[in-house]
């Protein structure tokens, strides 16, 4: 029944999704304003969702242009559906323009198809189809739309300062059948705060180093600019050998007498950096072989001592595991250095329930002082957990099982979704077990089958929660 309903809307779903995907809704602080708190792109995407909601007869409510909601239904209780329309930067290497959606016979290719514009449109159409059916709503629905999920969650922080907390809810921003627990998440900087004079003339001086754009992405590109006093040919040959030995792609060029070294890695979501290749850490590994100036030497040595080849916090003394929620993970997402202001490592750390986060961070901060580094801690989001046997979770899972015959149990993840904003919130789709996960990677796509099946599952789930008693 539900799949047949969705079939009647397939062309509309694709057309509305294409319009949303065409908006480059990447956070841009340089262009932020009161009217566009995280930049014009995210604001434009939020307005786009309001426009299609108004077209279809829904009421909307805007919250300072950084978040808002689409309203449906009636009743005392509220089902929250928490979506986001901001995306991570496209990065390089796409086979098509990431903000000019390509629709093939079986897929749609663009940044945001999986994370989270495709699932957002799927959830929206589930609500729209039920509204078109004139169902007898028993709950209100607030489809809450954020514009800063990929960075600091300013959107939901602002939203829940003044707006009603849903009774229960889900975020269509992960996998089916249901994510009932999420690790704690924090970002912090390790800042080099002690600069040392060079007693002897170094053979090499690190002028600048840059790798990574986001804390929650494994960097796929790194560049170092090095002043080489002598033996430049030897350095280039050693670098080429290093690339070969580590199965890496990279390049070396000379720019106005400065040696420019680049390494290409593999970008993946920061919740599991072990499946990516951190270009920045590899390039620092090579730089450790050079007799650098003292500041750079300390910076590079710190990386190798604490960060390189340590995706689970081993070298930081933070290795920890639980059977329910898994391991601590550490992603070094941003690395910067220049010879005037020294260096910085930007880290995204995720941890399961039971990990003594504050104690571990205090110990680590004290330990690294001797190497000239300090911790600057950002926002901390504690772990989030809902019992998988809760009737709400079971209704979602039943809708999934009815349509897929897949009996996989709900599980927990290292990722962080808007679900953790809710007292009773889970993540629900829209990835299936056979979906290729290219979130935060080049050539991100969603298959039409996945898009329509997710819409159908959301349709049944919302009907079960908000129409049936």
Swiss-Prot record:
Its cofactor is Zn(2+). Its EC number is 3.4.13.-. InterPro entries: Bact_exopeptidase_dim_dom, M20A_pepV-rel, Peptidase_M20, Peptidase_M20_dimer, Peptidase_M20A. Zn(2+) 2 binds at residues 84, 115, 173. It is an enzyme of class 3 (hydrolase). Binds 2 Zn(2+) ions per subunit. It comes from the Bacteria. Pfam families: M20_dimer (PF07687), Peptidase_M20 (PF01546). CDD domains: M20_PepV. The keyword Metal-binding applies. Keywords: Dipeptidase, Hydrolase, Metal-binding, Metalloprotease, Protease, Zinc. One of its GO terms (biological process) is proteolysis. One of its GO terms (molecular function) is dipeptidase activity. The active site is at 86, 149 (proton acceptor). Zn(2+) 1 binds at residues 115, 150, 440. NCBIfam families: dipeptidaselike, PRK07318.1. PANTHER family: ACETYLORNITHINE DEACETYLASE, N-ACETYL-L-CITRULLINE DEACETYLASE. Belongs to the peptidase M20A family. This is Putative dipeptidase SAR1836.
């Amino acid at each position: 029944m539900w799949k047949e309903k969705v079939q009647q809307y397939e062309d509309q779903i694709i057309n509305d999704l294409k319009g949303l995907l065409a908006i480059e809704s990447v956070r841009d602080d340089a262009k932020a304003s009161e009217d566009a708190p995280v930049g014009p792109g995210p604001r434009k995407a939020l307005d786009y969702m309001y426009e299609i909601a108004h077209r279809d007869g829904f009421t909307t409510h805007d919250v300072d242009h950084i978040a808002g909601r689409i309203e449906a239904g009636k009743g005392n209780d509220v089902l929250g559906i928490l979506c986001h329309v901001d995306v991570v930067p496209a990065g390089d290497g796409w086979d098509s323009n990431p903000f000019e959606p390509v629709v093939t016979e079986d897929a749609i290719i663009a940044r945001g198809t999986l994370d989270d514009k495709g699932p957002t449109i799927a959830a929206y159409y589930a609500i729209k189809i039920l509204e078109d059916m004139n169902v007898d709503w028993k709950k209100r629905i607030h489809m809450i739309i954020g514009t800063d999920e990929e960075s600091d969650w300013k959107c939901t922080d602002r939203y829940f300062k003044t707006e009603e907390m849903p009774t229960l809810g889900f975020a269509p921003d992960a996998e089916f059948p249901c994510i009932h627990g999420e690790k704690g998440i924090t970002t912090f900087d390790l800042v080099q705060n002690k600069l040392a004079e060079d007693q002897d003339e170094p053979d090499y001086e690190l002028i600048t180093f840059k790798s990574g754009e986001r804390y929650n992405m494994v960097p796929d590109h790194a560049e170092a600019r090095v002043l080489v006093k002598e033996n430049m040919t030897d350095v280039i040959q050693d670098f080429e050998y290093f690339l070969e030995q580590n199965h890496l792609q990279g390049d070396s060029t000379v720019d106005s007498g400065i040696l420019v070294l680049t390494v290409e890695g593999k970008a993946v979501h920061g919740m599991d950096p072990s499946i990516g290749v951190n270009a920045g850490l590899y390039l620092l590994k090579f730089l450790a072989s050079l007799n650098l100036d003292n500041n750079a030497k300390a910076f590079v040595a710190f990386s190798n001592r604490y960060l390189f080849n340590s995706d689970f916090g081993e070298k930081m003394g933070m290795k920890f595991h639980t059977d329910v929620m898994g391991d601590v993970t550490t992603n070094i997402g941003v690395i910067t250095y220049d010879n005037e202001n020294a260096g910085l490592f930007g880290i995204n750390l995720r941890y399961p329930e039971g990990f003594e986060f504050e104690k571990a961070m205090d110990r680590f901060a004290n330990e690294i002082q001797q190497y000239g580094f300090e911790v600057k801690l950002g926002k901390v989001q504690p772990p989030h957990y809902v019992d998988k046997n809760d009737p709400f979770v079971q209704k979602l899972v039943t809708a999934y099982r009815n349509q897929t015959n897949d009996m996989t149990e709900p599980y927990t993840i290292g990722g962080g979704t808007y679900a953790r904003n809710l007292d009773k919130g889970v993540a629900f789709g829209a990835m299936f077990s056979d979906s290729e996960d290219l979130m935060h990677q080049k050539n991100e796509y969603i298959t039409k089958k996945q898009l329509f099946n997710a819409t159908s599952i959301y349709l049944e789930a919302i009907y079960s929660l908000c129409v049936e008693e």
